[in-house]
A protein has these predicted regions:
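N-terminal pre-domain segments of enzymes
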Residues: 1-18
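Accessory beta-strand-rich segments of carbohydrate-active enzymes
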Residues: 7-12, 26-32, 64-181, 206
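Mature N-terminal segment immediately following signal peptide/propeptide cleavage
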Residues: 16-28
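Short, solvent-exposed loop/turn elements at domain surfaces
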Residues: 28-38, 58-61
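Short Gly/aromatic-enriched secondary-structure transition segments
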Residues: 36-48
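Short flexible loop/turn segments that cap and initiate beta-strands
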Residues: 38, 137, 208-210
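Beta-strand-rich binding/interaction modules
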Residues: 102, 193-210
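Short beta-strand segments of immunoglobulin-like
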Residues: 184-190
């Protein structure tokens, strides 16, 4: 199967050891937002399929359901290769509130549908074996949330496009050293003919900025 959006989502930080997780995931609607109570995160299978990173409202996802989707679930099995490195799971964006599970254990909770986030899952995976990644995405009516990806009306009035729920940007794995660079920012000055570089490094037990 051809992987959609196969390019690295952050080419400035493309490392040799990365795996694009776009493509087919298992998927299930949770209209009553009761899946966490019913422990969907312990399931080995969900009831349908979806093509990530396209949201379930999109035809490209294979679903194309434009009704109100208060909660959706995703499941993907990933084999973690044997290596003496840390394993970082990246999400380009998940709209709006998300719970991330690895091998049926909650590892991260994120609120906000516009900015990417990452999770160090090293201590939750079994190397050399198949591991389960499960995502619960909750996205009810706006109720004070930033407008843009949702509308209180079925036909998306005051919203420039169809509602967007759940994963809508690339998901990928990265294998990194115990100490690694997380991000770099550049500040340029034409007047001073200078460039300042701000580096954020993840050390084994702390984050260093310089």
């Amino acid at each position: 199967m051809i992987i959609p959006r196969s390019e690295h989502p952050n080419p400035q930080f493309e490392r040799e050891n990365w795996v694009n997780l776009n493509g087919e995931w298992e998927f299930e609607l949770d209209r009553g937002v009761s899946g966490r109570d019913r422990k969907f995160y312990e399931r080995e299978h969900l009831d349908s399929k979806i093509i990530v990173p396209f949201c379930p409202e999109s035809i490209l996802s294979g679903i194309g359901n434009t009704d109100y989707l208060n909660c959706v679930w995703y499941l993907k099995r990933v084999k973690i290769k044997k290596c003496n490195k840390r394993v970082i799971l990246h999400f380009g964006a998940v709209d709006y509130e998300s719970y991330i599970y690895v091998n049926h254990k909650e590892v991260y909770h994120n609120i906000g549908g516009y900015v990417g986030f990452e999770v160090d899952i090293t201590n939750y995976v079994e190397v050399g074996k198949e591991n389960t990644i499960t995502v619960c995405a909750i996205d009810g009516h706006p109720n004070g949330k930033a407008s843009g990806k949702q509308s209180e009306n079925y036909y998306s009035i005051e919203c420039c496009y169809t509602r967007t729920t759940g994963i809508w940007q690339t998901v990928w794995l990265e294998y990194v050293e115990k100490n690694y660079v997380k991000s770099v920012r550049y500040y340029t000055s034409i007047e001073q003919k200078s460039v300042q570089i701000e580096v954020e490094a993840q050390l084994r037990y702390s984050i260093l900025r310089f």
